[in-house]
Each structure stands twice: as structure tokens, then as C-alpha cells.
Amino acid sequence: MRLLVVDRFAKEAKALRRDFEARFADPRRATADRFVWDLWHVAGQYTALRTPAWEFFQKKAYDAFHQRLVWWGRRTLGCHDVSPPWLSCYVNGCEQRLHGDLPHGPVAFVFSLTKWATRSFRGGQTLLLRDEVLDFWRGFVSTRAVEEPEVLDEVPARFNRLVAFDPRIPHGVRRVDGSMDPTEGRLVIHGWFVQPRPFIEGPLPEKALEGAIHRITGAIAPILEAGLPLAGLLSLGFTVTPAGKATRLRTLADTTRTPKEHAPGRRRLLSLVRKALETHVFPRRSSPSRVTLPLVFER
């Protein structure tokens, strides 16, 4: 997984947008709640207006959105929480040049409250360096032209869109050219999914996963000890039946990466992980349990 895009993510999006617009609708109004922005500027790298999202919005709508985001991260990524989210506004001249986020969290997110369909500005897309560039010479063809679409993936900040991506990949925000009015800028809530750990919905106790994790560790240890240079997050989802069998095993998110010459070893490791889970016997319970199991590899 390098990128996940979820449109129409949160029913709270319209309420959050209304809250923002109500505060900044009248530029001559000088109430205290308007004085919230940090102009974050690192020359040649970052320029944006930002403020803590949880302090900006009305509590009811924001709390509902925050819980939706957290639960999505648990069920989809196996990440227990999110970092304290920022609310950032990009007006004329704002941008983020290419950078990688280390070690903030295994998955970054950007949730857009931008009126993208009616925007008056240019730019504002999320940019990610393509994998072909990260290993540029391996697939190089001297007769093939290379222009920006072959170098960068571009993701529009559509309203109510959640974008989750591997933050190790160099990424940024295309420079915004247009209005200085915050209500006409690129508006996003962003941060990182953090604290990968097992998540269970159902009667299976978390302690019951210890045997499965031990089995997985034993299965993949020889490959890792042989020097497989693997790094990233592998999150698996499965259902444990009342009889204790793991079924409906699926990969929810996989940011594991190796140099290309080690790709067969990576595939072998992933196969061993699946086999270890499929053959493990869990304790019997009266009803099924839904499990998200994240595995973190570092080097």
C-alpha cells in the first residue's frame, strides 16, 4: 500500500465546513476565535496556516469525526490511535515541498474540507513521488520521455476525501496560487495513524493472539535472520470462528518494502505469515471475533 483514497468519508464533513466558514465569513470581524493561526514557514520547504484541529471546531461534530477516523484506522490499518491532528489552510503562496515523514507514524492521512469543485485557486494537490523514481535506473529506457506525470502522482483534495499513504515516500502539496481568503483556500485535517497493535471485536481475548504471533515469528525468523532487509507495516484482517479457526484472511494494508532484488524473499515471508495464521488454532468461543493484526518490520 502506498496510497488509499476514500471519498465521502465522514458525514460530519459539512458541519465542520460550516463551522469554519461561520468563523471567517466576515473579514472585518475581529473576535478572539479568529486569532488561531500559526503561519508555519520553513524557507524553501513549508508554508501554511495551521492550528490544532481539536481546539478549532465545535466539540460535537469534531468528536464524532475524530472517533470515525480512529475506528477506521483500527479496522483498516491496525493502528490504535491518531496523532493530534492539525487543521491547515493553504492560501496564495502556501505549499509543502517534497519530504518524508520519519518517524511520525506508519501511515499518514489528509482529510479534505476544501470546496474543491468550486475552487478559485490553482494547485493544492497532494503529491507523491512514484515508485519508478525511487528506483529510477532499474527500469530506465533511454528512448522514453519523462515528464512530471511519470515522476509524481497527484491526488486532488476533493471535499470529504480521506487520503492515507505511506509517509516514508517523498510527498508534498503543490503550491497554491489564488486568493488570500481562508474560506477560498485548501483546507485539510491531517496527521498520522499511530500505535499499531492488535484490535479485536468479539469475545476472543487479546492474550489469545500471543500464540499466533509466536507461530508467525517462528515461521519468518529464518528469512529475517538470513538478512532480508524488510521495513514497513503489514496489517492483516481475519475472522476467528467459534471453533477457533482463522477464516476470511485478507491483507488490509501493506507498506512493507525491500530493495527490488529481495522481492522474492518478501513474497515468501508474506506467504509464511498467511500460512501460520491459517493453520493456527485459537481458543473456542461462543461467537466469532473480527481481528486486525498489524505486524511492524524495522531495519
Regions found by a protein language model. Give the residues of each.
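Non-heme Fe(II)/2-oxoglutarate
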Residues: M1-R75, E201-A219, A231, T241, ...
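Extracellular/periplasmic catalytic domains that process cell-envelope and extracellular macromolecules
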Residues: L102-G105, P156, P182-T183
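Conserved double-stranded beta-helix
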Residues: A30-R138, R168, W192, G202, ...
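Charge-biased low-complexity segments
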Residues: R144, E150-L152, R161-L162, R168, ...
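Residue-level detector of conserved, well-ordered beta-strand and adjacent loop positions
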Residues: D7, S88, R174
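Conserved hydrophobic/aromatic beta-strand scaffold that supports enzyme active sites
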Residues: L3-V5, L87, V110, E154, ...
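Double-stranded beta-helix
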Residues: L129-V163
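Phosphate/oxyanion-binding loops and surfaces in catalytic or ligand/nucleic-acid-binding neighborhoods
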Residues: R23-D26, W116, P196
